[in-house]
Amino acid sequence: MLHVSASKGMTEYFKNILDNVKNLYDLAEGCRKSGYDVTDHVEIPLAKDMADRVEGIVGPKNVAERIRELVSDLGKEPAALEIAKEIVEGKFGEFGREVGAEQAVRTALAVITEGIVAAPLEGIAHVKIKKNNDGGEYLAIYFAGPIRSAGGTAQALAVLVGDYVRKNMGLDKFKPTDDEVERYGEEVDLYQSEVTTFQYQPKAEEIRVAVRNISVEITGEATDDVEVSGHRDLPRIETNQIRGGALLALVEGVLLKAPKILRHVDKLGIEGWDWLKELKSKKEELVEEIEEENDEFNYEEEEDLSQYEDYEVEAVTKFIGEVIAGRPVFSHPSKKGGFRLRYGRSRNTGFATDGFHPAIMYLVDDFMAVGTQLKTERPGKATCVVPVDSIEGPIVKLNDKSVLKIDTVEKAKQYRDDVEEILFLGDILVNYGDFLENNHTILPSSWCTEWYEKILKSENLEYTKEFIENPDQKEVVKYAKLTNTPLHPKYTYFWHDISKDNINVLRNWIIGGRYNESNDSWGLTYDPEDPEISIVKRYLELIGCPHTVVDEKVEIFEYYPLLYSLGYDFDEKQDVVEDIEEKLQNTKNNMHFINTIAPFEIRRNAYIYVGARMGRPEKAASRKMKPPVNGLFPIGNAGALVRLINKAVDEGKTDEIEISNVKCSCGNVSLYRTCPFCGSSVEPSGPSRIKLPIKEYWYKALENLKINKAGDVKCIKGMTSKDKIIEPLEKAILRAKNDIFVFKDGTTRFDCTDVPVTHFRPVEIHGDIEKLKSLGYLKDIHGNPLENENQVLELNVQDVIVPESCMDYFLNVSKFIDDLLEKYYKKDRFYNVNKREELVGHLIIGMAPHTSAGMVGRIIGYSKANVGYAHPYFHASKRRNCDGDEDAFFLLLDAFMNFSKRFLPDKRGGQMDAPLVLTTILDPKEVDGEVHNMDSMWEYPLEFYEKSLEGIAPKEIKKIMETVEDRLDKESQYEGIGYTHETLKIDEGPLVCAYKTLGSMMEKTSAQLAVAKKIRATDERDVAEKVIQSHFVPDLIGNLRAFSRQGVRCKCGAKYRRMPLKGICRKCGSRLILTVSKGAVEKYMDVSQTMAEKYNASDYIKQRLEIIRSGIDSLFVNDKRKQVKIEDFFK
């Protein structure tokens, strides 16, 4: 019986997944019981819901059922507090006071974070009961760096939970001394100057107020090698170093999320937090600006905004504060010609991913590939690039001065080398849900066909689909005049981007033209040498009107609506505007003027231009440790720098390393639970230093696998786990045979950028129709039987579409697993696949690096794009959105057979990015709440577009918009999710970002600035200055400092903070090597100065570079010893 609301078809889908999981689990369990692995059972517990995940990750035992009851009755946060209370009361076993308090805090935090992230395990080091100076006992929570993965709200709630536990244990409040209070302030300042900045910069007094009033001690482990200088050696603070975890919980938790804490405190009736109200009132506006960016829309007049009103949108410059070399700026903040804001969701957008016309992806020299991350001005901080070809594409000026609207990929490829300037970048498609999630003001919508169609529908006017999508120019004028409706968006130009006086100048030039009957165009005289004509021609470009320049003539083929917009009646061949000068004087602005002279209403084409710059390039690559290895079998330094065990065997080398081992009764040293020499069952006693019998184990492994000779096999130097238990060498040999690599936990992974998709066409995923039917895809979105590869199907929530390169890698992984089953466990092969399509239907795990819980997925196809397509729910189940982050896929059977907790590093954060528990069925209620804000409509209502002109908060129109939240606990939560904009191919556009294909940094920056130069919305001089200031200068200074403070290393692996007095390695006697080279220090010097000169950077930047140059020269150039000639002495 499933615990989720689902239709019969979805229930069957989930049952199929559960059956397949069980089959794989049983197969792996049988292999484990053979005794050849670290344990005799599969080490990944299965979880059907959040409660199971919590119990599986942090415990205590038998807590899952109670969590379900409490969450059902109370909700998540109250349930977390109640479960913490019951734990300290001993309802789940007797614990010591400190152990019970720690268990309570961990379990409560796990409930709050849905049992997915690693914070409850790794983010809380421990909980102690300590004493105040008056003898009273209080609770201290020791936070660690991985608490960051919980997010600010959960960090704050962890402190709140600690206070609740303290009260239920009858403990006193924490009473800090003045030195302890000031220590926090010193650490916060030091952290921001030496480590990194916080999202919120608190004032010293805010820190004092918080520390004095929080009833538990927020403390933690040392996380950074930076020590305080003032408030040192305090009795109750164990370290003089920065406590990064504690600072995160205090600053980005309690202080930043004060309003949210207050809401929970009031809702739950917890006392002792009233002091937060004072903090909230002092900083609420600043918090909203940082957290919500909700105060950017300002009006010059108090009346509602209309297309005639002047208005001002405050540019958000934060995204462009730092520009990385080689990664272009596509549009400066709110700059004219930038990305035009358009509302809606395509089947491959939403959940922080925005749509762009694929044509612009080619025209910016391939710097926007499918999956490339952009840092954006609004509504969020970042997005992921995906193609949507039903929105407006770019408008460009060619080298021959013609202006062309690029509305197809074919045109983009045809003209890409002839583009002189990109006048308009085209649309950015953003869904309402992203504004709701960021609590960002709903900004005015651009004038688009979907809004236009809603107006026609509301007035019960007749029209055809062809008229909406591609109308005839004469038809739209007649229709607008006849029906008294606004001019069609296709022929509505950017009149608002030039002044009304400029419009009048342009009008006079255009009306002075003549009709060319031979080619049905409107001709204008054009002399490029005439400055006045060049200026007015520029106005024509700036309104985005397509035209062709031929033989010193400008020819306009879409002349009919243009002439009527300017008050010229083409049919009557006369100017119908009277008193034009009076109209210029009496109109408020450009839009008012154009509407006064036109015979129909002309809407404002664009209200909002969105700025953006490139973030990270897309990624699709196998996960490798540094350096890449095939197995977790340690060989110390025997394999030299290349770590090849076969080389060590050939050269007869070995090494002494610390490893778990036991002396077997047969006389041999066994490193495994089953002695490879006699087959006896043994139990390694624990780690100790031994001389590793590499040769014996190598040949025994080859014999066991019946392999005569193996190729190169890379191994690790040593284990970092607690017990130092190793993986069988046979697995490393078989991985090397199949050209795959191992991760720290024994699994083999593939990383790719997260991209959402709710619907797909079989042709996009190389899908076979019959195979898709066997996987449950029987009908398309219109209810028609699946018959051809171009039908649109709704994606099931746990199905994934992997990159082509991932499919190839998984082919190798499947062959490795089959070899392992056959040659090592002596069982039948399982996958038996030889081509990509044969992997369709097999199960994988999806997992994010900051979590400790995996999600079962099913491969249904592959695409050429270097991204991992999955349902937004699937990404949300990993506590991810889709703003450019990357996560891992790995085969489920690989994880069941090869994962072990005992391989994980014994250090803080070692259990992150490991599948400590596996969710088998996706429940939308238990995923990251951000996806609940994603809209699920097939169309936006007319009221939405009208309300957008008022600049209202997104919550104010929530009642007219359907989101995923409205579907929860209904069968429709899994099916029937809509989208507003179609796209032909989800992987249309460049597949590899140019940043990855260019070579040197000089090439990258040259290409970056070439893009900036041809985009109207970008200032290349500002880009050059920002690259130098935010990237090159800090890097040059940092490397210069690192060179002077560097240690040395030896080829044997030894490292020294300072050069030994002997000048050679104390371990092996070899020559020592610098860790920072001269080249590393100088690498950006020449390119920085070249850019500064070429783009005329400010004198300040040039002088700063000169100072850095002199610093480098003083370090590497000996100015006291100079080569001279003998004749110099006779001068």
From Swiss-Prot:
Catalyses which reaction(s): DNA(n) + a 2'-deoxyribonucleoside 5'-triphosphate = DNA(n+1) + diphosphate; Exonucleolytic cleavage in the 3'- to 5'-direction to yield nucleoside 5'-phosphates
Keyword Nuclease: yes
Subunit structure as annotated in this protein's UniProt entry: Heterodimer of a large subunit and a small subunit.
Species annotation: Methanococcus maripaludis (strain C5 / ATCC BAA-1333)
Record Pfam families: PolC_DP2_cat, PolC_DP2_central, PolC_DP2_N
Protein name according to UniProt: DNA polymerase II large subunit
Keyword Glycosyltransferase: no
NCBIfam families in the cross-refs: polC (TIGR00354), PRK04023.1 (NF003103)
GO terms (BP aspect): DNA catabolic process; DNA-templated DNA replication
Key words of the record: DNA replication, DNA-binding, DNA-directed DNA polymerase, Exonuclease, Hydrolase, Multifunctional enzyme, Nuclease, Nucleotidyltransferase, Transferase
Job description of the protein: Possesses two activities: a DNA synthesis (polymerase) and an exonucleolytic activity that degrades single-stranded DNA in the 3'- to 5'-direction. Has a template-primer preference which is characteristic of a replicative DNA polymerase.
Family: Belongs to the archaeal DNA polymerase II family.
Matching HAMAP family: DNApol_II_L_arch
Database matches in InterPro entries: PolC_DP2, PolC_DP2_cat_dom, PolC_DP2_central_dom, PolC_DP2_N
Superkingdom in the source lineage: Archaea
Entry EC no(s): 2.7.7.7, 3.1.11.1
GO MF term (any one): DNA binding
Taxonomic lineage from the root: Archaea, Methanobacteriati, Methanobacteriota, Methanomada group, Methanococci
